[in-house]
A protein has these predicted regions:
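Hydrophobic/aromatic-rich alpha-helical bundle segments in the mid-to-C-terminal region
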Residues: 101-105, 121-186
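Solvent-exposed, amphipathic alpha-helical segments
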Residues: 2-6, 53-57, 86, 90, ...
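Helix-turn-helix
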Residues: 2-37, 41
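Secondary-structure edge/capping motif, primarily at the C-terminal ends of alpha-helices
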Residues: 61, 94, 150-154
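Short helix-capping/turn signature of helix-turn-helix
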Residues: 32, 77, 90-96
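Amphipathic alpha-helical packing segments from all-alpha helical-bundle domains
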Residues: 50-56, 78-88, 98-126, 134, ...
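Short, basic, alpha-helical segments at the C-terminal edge of helix-turn-helix-like DNA-binding modules
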Residues: 44-50
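Hydrophobic alpha-helical connector segments
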Residues: 37, 41, 54-84, 135-139
Length: 186
């Protein structure tokens, strides 16, 4: 998982994994005879780690805090953690590799349908239905896109402004704010 996040998919070879983990190549090949077997195990491991981090964010929600703000801040932090970086690297690599795309599909669907929805639902305590799903999707996909962006100037300022807009938009969709709150003049 760490190698995927740090050096990327192309450089995460069986030989590199063996070297970094201190295993002989033979020992690694005994447990993972093919790159595909290693990938399947890595995807399952990464998925489990992402789920645990999301649950910890739910469990760590401060009492009395704005749940929408907490959910967005928590997910933003998680997107910079190794399991999320590794999964993003696999998703990027899957664009050009059909077999990897097929291997990732189940994990992506599980995360989209269950884990991310349930955990963010617990975080924001939103309602059900298309409006609230749109709120969660807006926040999730904006944050994921922003996490992958390479802002070339004023990165912190631009990021902070975008995070504030995402929070206000999510509140509006959750009927906790007005359209005029999206970009207040001040």
């Amino acid at each position: 998982m760490r190698l995927l996040a740090e050096v990327g998919y192309a450089e995460t070879t069986n030989a590199r994994v063996a070297l970094e983990t201190g295993l002989t190549r033979g020992a690694l090949l005994y447990h993972f005879p093919t790159r595909e077997a290693l990938l399947d195990a890595a995807i399952a491991h990464i998925q489990s780690a992402r789920t645990k981090l999301l649950q910890a964010a739910v469990d760590g929600a401060p009492k009395g805090a704005d749940r929408t703000d907490h959910a967005i801040d928590a997910y933003w932090r998680l997107l910079h953690e190794t399991p999320f970086l590794a999964f993003a690297e696999l998703e990027a690599a899957a664009r050009a590799e059909i077999q990897l795309k097929a291997r990732l599909k189940a994990a992506q669907e599980a995360f989209d349908r269950a884990e991310i929805g349930d955990h963010l639902f617990d975080l924001v305590q939103g309602g059900e239905g298309p409006r609230f799903q749109a709120s969660r999707d807006l926040a999730r996909f904006m944050l994921e896109g922003l996490a992958r962006a390479r802002l070339t100037y004023d990165g912190k300022g631009r990021t902070d402004r975008l995070l504030a807009v995402v929070k206000r938009a999510a509140r509006m969709l959750n009927r906790k704010g007005s359209l005029h709150d999206l970009w207040p003049e001040s």
